[in-house]
From Swiss-Prot:
Taxonomic lineage from the root: Bacteria, Pseudomonadati, Pseudomonadota, Alphaproteobacteria, Hyphomicrobiales
Record's protein name: GTPase Der
Family, as annotated: Belongs to the TRAFAC class TrmE-Era-EngA-EngB-Septin-like GTPase superfamily. EngA (Der) GTPase family.
Annotated ranges, domain KH-like: 380-464
Keywords: GTP-binding, Nucleotide-binding, Repeat, Ribosome biogenesis
Organism: Bartonella tribocorum (strain CIP 105476 / IBS 506)
Length: 474
């Protein structure tokens, strides 16, 4: 079983910087402003030959249990309960504060092994803070600089001393684990031959996106059946894109909770800009994006812009009408919402839209059934023979128009990629092909090969002119 380490401390001592250093990627948002991290985030990490899972946590603050800070503290306590070892981080440059003393007592009560980490020790002013740290009663401080990567060898040794060599290296006895940077943004080229088999062993990456306060984190907590993510009435609670592993009916899922996306004109703070960039990366890394609409006020301009972004990125869009428990005339409302989906988002015909209540856990199975169905379609490959049989029929039924007195000729079609399905048509004079005829072909592909509800790409290529080379030879 993998060693799990939680990074704990008051706000702005460098916990997220240390987390990013250990995982080898800039996953957690980092800013000079205190309280950037709100939810706990877990990821595979490596420190030289030592491998483990590390949890980044919200800064511990003294506040009532029902306040935002109090709920953040509950998330940190849950991380402490999950962990085998705690890295208690303090700011050596600033020295020990009353909050450090208070929270050191809380961490000691957990009974877990603790390594006291003196961060920002590259500063000349840090020596005094390291001496003060003995007052915490957590043993000898380990001086490091997470920002500059200093002292990490000593941190490795301190972790091994705290848990013992056998526990520290238990993961190495299992199959080697490689940590790779997340690939972001690019469509996945599929160069395999036809007849690609759908691989159910791979986890599906699902991002939960939407404007602020539509219930994204509440929905994920209902899926997991635990208070894994911070929720509340305040808009904009989520800042990082948090990934959580889940299993639904035997299928492995990786869920990404994202920060709410507002209109550009309202995004002013540097921290919110970082959150938005993190959300956009999560959308591009995902395969399926659940766009959460507030059913009591759906189809706001920002809802449609987020849906359009997901479609342009080529991901599988699925709309979740959340807060359905607040809707009175549910049947008539659902008919109206489906009609609006078709009217406001015509670029993806047959878009899946599911009513649900994240608060009460209603409609989640229906949502997941639609996700699984659309994910299969998104991965679909169609044989070239079937495509050209279809093309012959549709062109005979409705040939392309004549341009400047010359009829356009559509000759050949093949599928060049999946995820999303992409097709290339060989034709004469592709630059003058009307967009209306391209839409006719795309809609025909959707209908014939059952590809409704996902983006479909269609590109044109000029067919070879056999007389062009002869003319050049003359």
């Amino acid at each position: 079983m993998s060693l799990t380490i939680a990074i704990v401390g008051r706000p702005n001592v460098g916990k997220s910087t240390l987390f990013n250093r250990l995982v080898g990627q800039k996953l957690a948002l980092v800013d000079d402003k205190p309280g950037v991290t709100r939810d706990r985030r877990i990821h595979a990490a490596k420190l030289q030959d030592l491998r483990f899972d590390v949890i980044d946590t919200a800064g511990l603050e003294e506040a009532g249990d029902h306040t935002l800070e109090g709920r953040m503290r509950s998330q940190t306590k849950a991380a402490i309960d999950e962990a085998d070892l705690i890295l208690f981080v303090f700011d050596a440059k600033s020295g020990i504060t009353p909050s450090d003393l208070n929270f050191a007592s809380l961490v000691r009560k957990s009974g877990k092994p603790i390594v006291l980490v003196a961060n920002k020790s590259e500063s000349k002013a840090a020596t005094g803070g390291e001496y003060e740290a003995w007052s915490l009663g957590l043993g000898e401080p380990c001086p490091i600089s997470a920002e500059h990567g200093l002292g990490l060898s000593d941190l490795r040794d301190a972790i091994i001393d705290a848990v013992g060599s056998e526990r520290a290296f238990s993961n190495n006895k299992e199959e080697d684990m490689t940590i790779q940077p997340a690939s972001v943004g690019d469509d996945i080229e599929d160069l395999q031959e036809e007849g690609l088999i759908y691989d159910e062993s791979k986890p599906i990456r699902i991002a939960i996106a939407g404007r602020p306060n539509t219930g994204k984190s509440t929905l994920i907590n209902s899926m997991l059946k635990q208070d894994r993510l911070l929720t509340g009435p305040e808009a904009g609670l989520t800042r990082d894109s948090i990934s959580v592993d889940w299993e639904w009916r035997g299928r492995h899922i990786k869920l990404f909770d994202t920060a709410g996306l507002r209109r550009k004109s309202k995004i002013q703070e540097k921290l919110e800009k970082l959150s938005v960039a993190d959300t956009l990366r999560a959308i591009r890394f995902a395969e399926v994006v659940v766009i959460v609409f507030d059913a009591t006020m759906p189809f706001e301009k920002q809802d449609l812009q987020i849906a359009d972004l997901v479609i342009r990125e080529g991901r599988v869009p699925v709309i979740a009408f959340n807060k359905w428990d607040l809707i009175e005339n549910s049947q008539a409302t659902l008919i109206d919402l489906h009609e609006k989906c078709a009217r406001f988002l015509p670029q993806v015909r047959g878009l899946r839209a599911v009513p649900l209540s994240g608060q009460y856990g209603q409609g989640i199975d229906k949502l997941m059934e639609n996700i699984m169905m659309m994910h299969r379609v998104w991965n679909r490959r169609i044989s070239t023979a079937k495509l050209n049989q279809w093309l012959e029929i549709v062109v005979a039924h409705h040939p392309p128009p004549a341009i400047s007195g010359r009829r356009l000729k559509v000759k050949y079609i093949t599928q060049v990629k999946t995820r999303p399905p992409g097709f290339m048509i060989s034709c004469s004079r592709p630059k003058v092909m009307p967009q209306s005829y391209l839409r006719y072909l795309v809609n025909g592909l959707r209908e014939t090969f059952d590809m409704s509800g996902i983006p479909v790409r269609l590109s044109l290529r000029a067919s070879d002119n056999p007389f062009a080379t002869r003319a050049k030879k003359k």
